[in-house]
A protein has these predicted regions:
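Bacterial N-terminal signal peptides
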Residues: 12-22
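Blade-edge motifs of beta-propeller repeat domains
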Residues: 24-44, 76-93, 125-142, 173-190
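Beta-strand-rich domains and repeat architectures in extracellular enzymes and scaffolds
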Residues: 40-52, 59, 67
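Beta-propeller blade termini
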Residues: 47-56, 76, 96-105, 125, ...
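Hydrophobic beta-strand segments that make up the repeating blades of beta-propeller
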Residues: 50, 62-66, 111-114, 160-163
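Glycine-aliphatic tripeptides that mark coil-to-beta-strand junctions in extracellular
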Residues: 58-60, 107-109, 156-158
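A short loop-to-beta-strand structural motif that recurs across blades of beta-propeller domains
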Residues: 71-74, 120-123, 168-172
Length: 197
């Protein structure tokens, strides 16, 4: 056996011993990247879920729109990635989309919810205790499919843009007390769906 072959064998034996011994050292357990899932029961045919801090406690809460259940679920965030039992708020027929903003200037988030089957938008006002009350329904036309909040006329009050299923965009100007007045109706392309603002 040549000297080079002996050196190679010694190196391989040393490497195998080192690998074997390194497996004997106690190591830290790998981190748990995902906890077991937690399931929450909501209404029939959930269409949309959004996360927003609805009660100003700095923890994200969940809002779930249930189109077949004609309801909105509110799940208050606890702050550890879990949520309290869902509260159910009755809506109009076939709620389909929503957006969150402060519509009455009280610093508490409110909800605008498209009721596809009723042709209106429900304005649901938030309260300090994290609960909600149905304030008003605003008729917008046939088959509202999307809603977005923003100050479109620069008056400091939150307005709404609503798309209707068949080629219309409706602008509702906020009065500042949680109510809205119809401002404009625009022709849109066929089947408008979403309004990014």
């Amino acid at each position: 056996m040549t000297k080079l072959v002996r050196l190679k064998i010694k190196f391989l034996v040393s490497l195998l011993v080192a690998l074997f011994l390194s497996g004997c050292v106690e190591s830290q357990p790998s981190p748990d990247l995902f906890a077991l899932p937690v399931t929450y029961i909501v209404g029939k045919k959930p269409e949309v879920v959004i996360a927003r801090d609805m009660n100003n406690d700095e923890f994200p809460d969940l809002l779930v729109v249930n189109s077949a259940g004609n309801s909105l679920n509110y799940l208050e965030g606890i702050g550890d990635g879990t949520f309290k039992t869902p509260q159910t708020i009755e809506t109009g027929r076939e709620p389909f989309a929503l957006d969150v903003a402060d519509f009455n200037g009280d610093g508490i988030p409110d909800v605008a919810l498209c009721n596809y089957g009723d042709g209106n938008v429900s304005i649901i006002l938030g309260q300090k205790d994290g609960l909600f009350k149905l304030k008003t329904d605003v008729k917008v036309g046939r088959l509202p499919i999307a809603v977005a909040a923003g100050d479109f006329n620069n008056d400091g009050k939150t307005d709404l843009a609503v798309t209707l299923r068949f080629n219309k965009l409706i602008i509702l100007l906020g009065v500042g007390d949680g109510t809205f007045k119809l401002a404009e109706a625009y022709q849109a392309g066929p089947t408008p769906a979403y309004i990014p603002i």
